[in-house]
């Protein structure tokens, strides 16, 4: 399945628009990891633990988006966007990744 951030696919013709599809992942992070990630940020390094977790969550969101498109009979998703949101409250720290795009049939 073709997945692209562009509104069209060069060399392909969109013959049917299905609907907007989403892939959503909410992932928690624990206090100890938050603490050490904060220290890493202060000294100017990169937080490998967070980067790895975000990469996995992004992959899951895109896979979910692709599965929704397949269920609709699409063979491509155009206009894909991936958004990241931090969710904090009640002593919990989480982040949400949402991938969205338009499921289409191309030939």
UniProtKB/Swiss-Prot annotation:
Q: Gene3D superfamilies under this entry?
A: Hypothetical protein apc22750. Chain B
SUPFAM superfamilies from the UniProt entry: YbjQ-like (SSF117782)
Q: Name one Pfam family in it.
A: YbjQ_1
Superkingdom of the source species? Bacteria
User: What family is this protein classified in?
Assistant: Belongs to the UPF0145 family.
Q: What is this protein called?
A: UPF0145 protein PM1668
Taxonomic source organism: Pasteurella multocida (strain Pm70)
Q: What is the lineage of its organism?
A: Bacteria, Pseudomonadati, Pseudomonadota, Gammaproteobacteria, Pasteurellales
């Amino acid at each position: 399945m073709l997945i692209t951030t562009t509104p069209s696919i060069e060399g392909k013709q969109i013959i049917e628009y299905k609907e907007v599809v989403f892939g959503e992942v909410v992932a928690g992070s624990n206090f100890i990891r938050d603490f050490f990630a904060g220290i890493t940020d202060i000294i100017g390094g990169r937080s490998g633990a967070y980067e790895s977790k975000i990469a996995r969550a992004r992959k899951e969101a895109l896979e979910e988006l692709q599965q929704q498109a397949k269920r609709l009979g699409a063979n491509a998703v155009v206009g894909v966007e991936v958004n990241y949101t931090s969710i904090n409250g009640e002593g919990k720290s989480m982040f949400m990744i949402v991938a969205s795009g338009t499921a289409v049939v191309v030939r």
